Amino acid sequence: MEEMQNMSKKYPFQRIFLIVADSAGVGEEPDAAEFGDCGSNTWKHAAESVGQIRVPYMESMGLGDLDDIPGVSKVDHPKAYCLTCRETSRGKDTMTGHWEMMGVNTVKPFQTFTETGFPKELMDELSRQTGHKLIGNYSASGTEILRVLGEEQMKENSLIVYTSADSVLQIAAHEEVTGLQELYRCCEIARRLCMKPEWKVGRVIARPYVGTNKNDFHRVGGDRHDYALSPEEDTDMNILEQNGFTVSCVGKICDIFNGKGVTETQHTVSNEDGMDKTIDQLKNKDFTGICFVNLVEFDSEFGHRRNPVGYARALEAFDKRVGEFISHMRDDDLLMITADHGNDPTFHGTDHTREKVPLLIYSPSFKKGRQLEEAPTFGVMGATILENFGLKRNDDLIGEPLKEIFE
């Protein structure tokens, strides 16, 4: 009933699409030195790797006004409101970034086991409860660890356990040897064990793979499953849901929030699939609320794998889809394009980088856009969404609405 009432009301924007180009940061944060990330700049360095990047739609929205990106010009009259956002929370991971967009300030970083691997007590208990031998237990690239341990995992029907610079426990197993449901069962056990304070991680991730040997193993992204912690407090998504608004999620958003505040979700297998599903909602679904989208391949396929040319080409491909998206927008639609952290594909190591993120905000109803002052938190995104729908935020959520877009 509430949802029907909301659809009959008129808001500045009936449908808001928040698209996260996962890891596409625009330069080091002021505190980047504390994270070992001085000099990181995902957009700029990806663009440099191909000489000049061609992203005409995002260029017209003011992307080039935010940073010096080879091939992306500054524009005198951007079509969108454009700004950079700093991260208040103490982290540079997926959960921390997305949670902050929806108002959550993560004061204490999630626990990581990058240098040490997981404690023997945890590994022993996980092996006992799952009934599988565990191999690995170190920080690694997901593709590299399959080359090293994938054949052994198949022979023994063991489980490959590994981590990264993020607060994650990842379990890889062959889909045809271990089976998908068995992998999920083992990950559910790991999630329960990793609720203990001394072992608590932000996410447990099921990483199924296929192939016959180390030269052709590859992960099955569509069958990946994240077992995340739930935010301790209600987020902006909960407030929307509780007031009868649609919170439609595309990609891994539902997993990141552990389903909290989500009214419907669609998993994706690629950036293209994510944009296909998002544009389908734009063209064919009438709703009042938000469509929250994560496009993970920038991060998983090109950032972590330190493939700057691939990253640049993926950004160019995304820009074409942005153009397609814009062509189908209604005057009462709003598009927000952003990122959740950096992952400079030219940087040392294989992990995320502490960077500011771009925020491009566009509607066909805008008479003109302009560059806004840098925001001190990603929380301006959720705050602006609630402002649009006339909803009050909880006092413990961070971020102020960007009221300029309603002028």
Regions found by a protein language model. Name each.
Residues 1-407:
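Feature captures the catalytic ectodomains and active-site-proximal regions of enzymes
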